[in-house]
Amino acid sequence: LYERMGEEIAARGGIIRLHELVREIRPVPGGLAVRTRSGEEIFQRVLFTPSVPMLLQTVPSLPDGYRAFLSRIPYQANITMVLGLERSLSPYYWLNITDPDSPFVAVIEHTNLFRDPDYGGLIPVYLSRYLSPDHPFYTMKVPALRERFLSHLEQLFPHFHREWIQSFTFSKAEYAQPVIGLHYSKNKPSFQTPVEGLFLCTMVQIYPEDRGMNYSIKCAEELLCALGELERLTA
């Protein structure tokens, strides 16, 4: 899906810059200046899709009242390990782990839902945990955290052997998921920010849906409709 989207963007004259870091967005005469490691460019409109805390860091000119409004939305962090196994753990795609002693809350075996030959014969197993950024797991060294995860995996699946692991990756994100509280619909941020030409379209606006690819596309379509751009871009 991402490759196809990239092809379509390029075909319509868009430019995708991978591994670029946006340091600041600020209003200037004629539009918005976007400063990156490579320099500065001016655009008439900017659509911001990362997390709300990153918006607050990147756009210093946001009004104090708007900053306070967005700062009331709490976030959870996430840590994920992906094991490339030579054998399957179970016949199930998704297992929620409710044991309070478990270091992870989900075991996801993707190939039980969809087998992709691009995995090179390996079976990817996702071990995921949502947590507060001040939880010890978030700053724990990866080897120690890996040992905690694998030890508990052996308890859940006694037939599992560590020799099955042919690849291993670890990732974490401080702002992985906004926490939706009571009466959130009354406080859900709009797409338009107080800065002219700057729009926000991110997970805080997917409510009342849950996080997911389909709903992120729906959210983008709603923004394009609000801007009057959907018909032009889909023509």
Specify the residue positions occupied by each region the protein language model found.
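Mid-domain catalytic core of redox enzymes
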Residues: 20-125, 130-139, 143, 148-160, ...
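Conserved flavin/dinucleotide-binding core of flavoenzymes
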Residues: 110, 114-235
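Active-site catalytic microenvironments for nucleophilic, acid-base chemistry
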Residues: 8, 15, 54, 61, ...
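A conserved beta-strand/loop element that lines the FAD pocket in flavoprotein oxidoreductases
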Residues: 9-23
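A general secondary-structure junction signal
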Residues: 18-20, 26, 169-174
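A structural signal for the hydrophobic beta-strands that form the central parallel beta-sheet
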Residues: 16-18, 48, 200
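Helix-loop-beta segment of a Rossmann-like dinucleotide-binding subdomain
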Residues: 1-12, 130-132
